[in-house]
């Protein structure tokens, strides 16, 4: 699968742009704050239907118009497919091949992409929500139905929290507790099964990056892959926290509070790991995600690498560049200088100059 064309209208600082990328390596080069990451974000939007940055949809709209539009054309299984996303205010309209998709599985995982962004390096030391999001984004692309389970859980969670905050009687809260147990167990089961697949890859890749000197693990709070056991576990946890939930007016346990812990040599990476270990872990996770995605779906995802050379030292760059050269697939890389990539052997690539929101072939 490759992206053959992308058209942007009034997207952040990009008033109008059209790119026809190469099927292998594409470089977006320019100074900071010129529009490189915005372009990468627009490509990401075509596959994930939301930005990888925090914020509201309205923030994607530039100043030249009241709406923004991103259109992509893909070659998939020998057939051309189009994706169009229009955002007006807080409303988003998505069309695939000219039609609005009716279900999540018609959208997610159809045009897969994997992002490597500088801010992800801090995830091991950050809040649990960031690590959950990293895991869930990867999971959605191999199991689009996971999004339906996650949304059902969030809807139930919001309603249950409203009742708890209002001091509703236990019989009124009980049906929502039962629904929370059902949907929450499904979310935990999907995460557990994904990690069971990913962990062997993650460990092997990390071992290769660090020349076998260290071992890694990713510990998820729920270890069972049995749905009935997960339901009983969550039920027991909720019963234990009942008094605290009444006191604070919110749901105190569940998938929304789970913390996937990143470990190196049986030590919590967020507490004891070095910056280099954090970078190696995220690099290994992303590489494992790519390999797993290809195995599970049969499609090679687009790789979106945002200023990767600034976050990886020479050794880690060399490892990942070797990985990129060995695989077949489309890659988009942002950078401020060409020389590090040219020195790594990226001589056959299409280079675009990005300056003040305008994109053109590099001269």
Curated annotation (Swiss-Prot):
Keywords: ATP-binding, Cytoplasm, DNA damage, DNA repair, DNA replication, DNA-binding, Nucleotide-binding, SOS response
A family per Pfam: SMC_N
A GO CC term attached to the entry: cytoplasm
One GO process term, biological-process aspect: SOS response
InterPro entries: DNA-binding_RecF, P-loop_NTPase, RecF/RecN/SMC_N, RecF_2
UniProt-annotated binding residues for ATP: 30-37
GO molecular function: ATP binding; single-stranded DNA binding
Keyword Magnesium (UniProt): no
Subcellular location: Cytoplasm
The UniProt record lists the keyword Lyase: no
Family to which this protein belongs: Belongs to the RecF family.
Record's function text: The RecF protein is involved in DNA metabolism; it is required for DNA replication and normal SOS inducibility. RecF binds preferentially to single-stranded, linear DNA. It also seems to bind ATP.
PANTHER family in the cross-refs: DNA REPLICATION AND REPAIR PROTEIN RECF
Name assigned to this protein: DNA replication and repair protein RecF
Gene symbol of the encoding locus: recF
């Amino acid at each position: 699968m490759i992206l053959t064309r992308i058209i942007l209208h009034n997207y952040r600082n990009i008033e109008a742009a059209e790119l026809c990328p190469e099927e292998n390596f594409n470089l977006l080069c320019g100074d900071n704050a010129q529009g490189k990451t915005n372009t990468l974000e627009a490509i990401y939007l075509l596959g994930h239907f939301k930005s990888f940055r925090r914020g509201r949809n309205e923030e994607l709209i530039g100043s030249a118009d009241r709406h923004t539009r991103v259109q992509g054309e893909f070659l998939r299984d020998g057939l051309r497919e189009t994706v169009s996303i229009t955002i007006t205010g807080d409303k988003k309209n998505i069309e695939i091949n000219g039609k609005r998709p009716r279900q999540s599985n018609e959208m997610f995982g159809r045009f897969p992409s994997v992002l490597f962004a500088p801010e992800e390096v801090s995830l091991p030391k950050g809040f649990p929500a960031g690590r959950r999001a990293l895991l869930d984004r990867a999971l959605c692309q191999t199991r689009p139905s996971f999004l339906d389970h996650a949304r059902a859980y969030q809807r139930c969670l919001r309603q249950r929290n409203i009742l708890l905050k209002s001091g509703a009687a236990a019989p009124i809260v009980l049906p929502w507790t039962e629904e929370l147990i059902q949907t929450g167990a499904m979310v935990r089961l999907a995460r557990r099964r994904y990690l069971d697949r990913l962990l062997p890859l993650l460990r092997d890749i990390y071992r290769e990056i660090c020349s076998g000197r260290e071992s890694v693990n990713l510990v998820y709070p729920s270890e069972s892959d049995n749905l009935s056991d997960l339901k009983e576990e969550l039920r027991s946890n909720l019963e234990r926290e009942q008094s605290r939930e009444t006191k604070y007016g919110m749901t105190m346990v569940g998938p929304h509070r789970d913390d996937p812990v990143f470990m190196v040599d049986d030590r919590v990476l967020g507490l004891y790991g070095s910056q280099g270990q954090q970078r190696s872990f995220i690099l290994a996770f992303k590489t494992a995600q790519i390999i797993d995605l290809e195995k599970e779906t049969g499609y090679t995802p687009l790789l979106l690498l945002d200023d990767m050379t600034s976050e990886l030292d020479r050794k880690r760059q060399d490892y990942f560049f070797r990985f990129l050269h060995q695989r077949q697939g489309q890659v988009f890389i942002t950078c401020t200088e060409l020389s590090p990539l040219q020195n790594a052997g990226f001589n056959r690539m299409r280079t675009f100059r990005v300056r003040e929101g305008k994109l053109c072939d590099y001269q």
